[in-house]
Structure formats: C-alpha cells, structure tokens
C-alpha cells in the first residue's frame, strides 16, 4: 500500500494485488510467490519479477536476470557464470520430467520453480524466477526489479448470485471465458457472518439479493467505460444461459465497488469472527485445481467435512481454481486435533 500511495502509484502499480497489501512486503511476496485476486490477468509474482540482486551463502552479491546460456564464459567462469551453468544443466537434465509431472494449474506455487530453468525456444532464461517462491533458502534478495503496468482507467464489477455452492464452482469455468480480471468467491458462511458485523452489514444490503448460497465477484477493467458495461451485459446473458436469470448486481460506481471489495478483502477477519470455540483452521488451505475439476474437488472435500461431522469455509480465487478453505474445528479439544 505504501508503494501504491506514492508518486509511481498514480500511473503504474505492481499488479500482484494481495488482500494483505496493508502489511505485505515486496521481499515477502517474492519469497512466497504471492498472487492476489487478479492473478488470472497479471499472473503470479514469478511472472512479474524481471531481476533480483541477491546475496549467496558465501556473502557474494550477484545480479540475476535474463541471460542467454551461450553468453556464459565456459573457460574462465566467474562465480555467477559457474552457478548459472550448473542451474541450466539441471534444467536440461530434468526437462522431460518437469514437462511430464508439473501440474497444469495457474496457481502452482509449491516447491522450486525449476521449470524456469528449461531452455525455451528463444534461448533466453531468467534464473531470477528460480529465487521467486524459494523463501530465502537459495539466496537473500537485496533488491528486486519488478514489471509494472498502467492502472486501468475504469473498472466494473458484477456480483453473481448462486443458489448452491456447487453451481457457483461449476459456473466459474464458463465465466472466465469472458476474460475478466478477477472472479472471487464469497460463500454463505462469510455472508452470514458479515451480516452480524455492523462494519459490513450495511454494505452487504447494497449488493446481496435475498439468500444466495454463494457469490462470485466478477471484475472487468479497461480504458473506456462503455465496453466494460457491454461486458456486464455479456455476464448477465451468460448467467441467464446457465440458468441464473436476473442474478447479477452491477457495481459501476467506484465507491460501490470499494464497498464490495472491502468485504472480500476482509474475508479472513470475517471468518475468524465466528463465535464459540469452533473456528476455521488453516491446515489444508490453498490447494489449486484446474477449473474443470473445481466443482468436483470442492464437492468431494465438503463430503469429507460431513464425514467428520463438521463444515468448511470457502472464499477467494475461484478464477484460478485456488480457494481459501478451512475446516471448522474446536482445537481446544483432543477430538478437534484428531480430526485435523
């Protein structure tokens, strides 16, 4: 938020826009390969890091960035060249295994990004991307060169209402074909808890119609407003074709949109306001699946919750098949720990 509020932020911004932006740091976001609500448009942190200056274990400072492996000095390599040669050999050696086994999901952030070491057709590699997501285990970053993009002039938001959680998850794969910047989930639990919090109750009245089981917040951005309004019309038409007539609340006014996003960005705080000893527990959070599997994945996990006599809370990044999911457990009792 500090970066966004300064001069550069008036025109350009880092597009990895995490909900914890008020306290997140660029080093931390690079270390864990952060994503944010708009990663369907702007990608993960690894897609936005151009270079990293880092300290190695021996204290030597090295600049990592785009490099052609053919340009490295093979006869008298520097520490940097020798290290990069070894990394590129790993990429060549493991290329087939990576292509065969790495999951094809947009939110793959587990482990090291060794796929970034595989030689591409154009021959240029960027080993800085290996450091992204490594959480300080490979080197200590001292400076980070980021790709910045213009802030869109206009934004619009469609709040899509669904009578069941399964239908919301199944519909996501269709909604993303409209090329939105974000598709974010708000489930029934968050809606009900937010209604009990004065800070959010009045805001919900403006964009929640009736008693939906789930909401999907679909955002479009661009340089002109009229095409975005047309996108909202397309969204409503698609919802109707999926069987959900008159199920979209339009948010065109920026102040109205902010109220909607305020609720979504406070998702964790809202969930943790659950009264009593039963609380959403983070133990299986942030699994990512392909969108075609999202409805089945969430359905099977809900059945697992039922098997153990509990429920789960769900919210966040439906657009890329990565939801924040937490089973509701009483960790003050042995049974809660056992179920976890």
Model regions: which residues?
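Single conserved hydrophobic/aromatic residue that forms the stacking wall/gate
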Residues: 1-12
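A gly/ser-rich beta-alpha-beta helix-loop segment of oxidoreductase catalytic cores
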Residues: 10-51, 56, 108-126, 140
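Active-site loops and adjacent core secondary-structure elements that bind or stabilize anionic groups
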Residues: 11, 170-171
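Conserved phosphate/anionic-ligand binding catalytic regions in large, soluble enzymes, centered on
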Residues: 29-38, 124-148, 316-322, 326
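Flexible inter-domain linker/hinge segments
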Residues: 75-118, 124
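Terminal amphipathic helices with adjacent charged low-complexity linkers/tails
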Residues: 144-148, 178-278, 312, 316-318, ...
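Short glycine-/aliphatic-rich beta-strand segments at the starts of folded cytosolic domains
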Residues: 151-162, 214, 275-291
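Short, conserved charged micro-motifs
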Residues: 167-170, 223-232, 296, 334-339
């Amino acid at each position: 938020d500090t970066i966004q509020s300064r001069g550069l932020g008036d025109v350009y911004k880092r597009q990895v826009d995490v909900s914890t932006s008020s306290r997140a740091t660029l080093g931390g976001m690079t270390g864990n390969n952060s994503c944010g609500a708009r990663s369907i448009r702007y990608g993960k942190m690894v897609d936005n890091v151009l270079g990293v200056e880092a300290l190695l274990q021996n204290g030597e400072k090295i600049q990592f960035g785009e490099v052609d492996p053919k340009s490295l000095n093979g006869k008298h390599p520097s520490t940097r060249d020798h290290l990069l040669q070894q990394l590129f050999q790993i990429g060549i050696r493991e290329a087939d295994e990576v292509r065969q086994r790495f999951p094809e999901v947009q939110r793959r952030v587990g482990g090291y990004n060794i796929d970034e070491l595989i030689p591409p057709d154009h021959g240029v590699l960027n080993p800085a991307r290996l450091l992204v997501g490594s959480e300080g285990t490979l080197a200590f970053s001292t400076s980070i060169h980021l790709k910045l993009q213009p802030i869109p002039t206009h934004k619009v938001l469609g709040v899509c209402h669904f009578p069941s959680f399964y239908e919301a998850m199944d519909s996501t794969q269709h909604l993303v074909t409209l090329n939105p910047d974000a598709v974010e989930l708000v489930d029934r639990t968050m809606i009900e808890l937010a209604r009990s919090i004065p800070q959010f109750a009045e805001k919900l009245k403006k964009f929640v119609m009736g008693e939906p089981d789930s909401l999907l917040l679909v955002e479009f951005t661009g340089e002109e407003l009229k095409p975005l309004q047309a996108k909202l019309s397309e969204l409503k038409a698609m919802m109707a074709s999926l069987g959900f007539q008159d199920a979209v609340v339009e948010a065109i006014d920026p102040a109205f949109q902010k109220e909607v996003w305020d609720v979504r960005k406070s998702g964790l705080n809202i969930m943790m306001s659950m009264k009593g000893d039963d609380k959403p527990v983070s133990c299986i959070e942030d699994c990512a699946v392909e969108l075609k599997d999202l409805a089945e994945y969430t359905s099977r996990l809900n059945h697992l919750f039922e098997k153990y006599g509990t429920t789960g809370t769900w919210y966040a990044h439906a657009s890329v098949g990565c939801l924040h999911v937490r089973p509701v457990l009483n960790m003050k009792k042995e049974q809660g720990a056992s179920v976890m």
